[in-house]
């Protein structure tokens, strides 16, 4: 149910997991999936509360899940995502690696761990895992297309400074989010082919209000201040 990307589906999933926990407080996966669903709902504006409140609630759920079953790869996969959201990058990598060591063929694990690796400097390894996730599961559960997988690949190519490859992958995305929109036009600027009259460029300016850019940048979860500054400088020129 939490894979139905609607407010109703999210609420139903939370109620389902609460009932599962009520029936069996030691159900590790119920705690883990509740954390995932809370994060999804908050990120999309369906669950209220501050960012700090959400980190606390989801973190408590995941910590409880790991306490109950430290050998559950789902728990480590989700805990990696929680730490990434909190910009705790080394902890994100640690739990991502644990999930990967347990189930190295799960595309969700490959994708999540790959995202962390490229951010933390293991760019080639992370990019390889992101490519494998796309190959194994091009349309993730709950999605209608491969935009998520392609957008993840853009992150890897961005860190690798494979700007030509980045632009080619971006052509396969049906609807760009802020991350893909920013990366592709940043790449074009680096190659001196940026056209500010381009339709997709103008659509991004209309869709993503400038006042929200600092928040959007923060949600890219980029550890390196130098890279954050480069992206901020690029945005300031447009």
What are these regions, as identified by a protein language model?
Residues 1-108, 112-123, 128-129, 135-137, ...:
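Acidic, proline/glycine-rich low-complexity intrinsically disordered segments
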């Amino acid at each position: 149910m939490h894979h139905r990307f609607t407010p109703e589906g999210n609420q139903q999933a939370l109620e389902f997991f609460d009932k599962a926990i009520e029936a069996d407080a030691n159900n590790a996966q119920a705690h883990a999936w509740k954390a995932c669903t809370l994060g999804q709902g908050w990120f999309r504006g369906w669950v209220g509360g501050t960012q700090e409140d959400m980190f606390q609630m989801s973190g408590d759920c995941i910590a409880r899940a790991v306490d109950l079953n430290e050998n559950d790869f789902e728990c480590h996969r989700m805990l990696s995502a929680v730490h990434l959201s909190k910009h705790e990058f080394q902890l994100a990598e640690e739990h991502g690696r644990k999930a990967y060591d347990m189930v190295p063929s799960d595309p969700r694990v490959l994708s999540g761990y790959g995202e962390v690796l490229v951010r933390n400097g293991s760019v080639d390894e992370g990019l390889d895992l992101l490519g494998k996730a796309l190959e194994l599961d091009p349309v993730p559960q709950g999605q209608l297309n491969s935009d998520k997988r392609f957008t993840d690949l853009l992150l890897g190519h961005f860190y690798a400074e494979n700007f030509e490859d980045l632009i080619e992958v971006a052509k396969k995305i049906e609807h760009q989010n802020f991350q893909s929109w920013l990366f592709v036009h940043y790449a074009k600027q680096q190659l001196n082919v940026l056209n500010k009259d381009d339709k997709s460029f103008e659509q991004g300016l209309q869709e993503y209000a400038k006042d929200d850019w600092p928040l959007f940048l923060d949600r890219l979860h980029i550890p390196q201040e130098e890279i954050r500054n480069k992206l901020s400088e690029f945005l300031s020129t447009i």
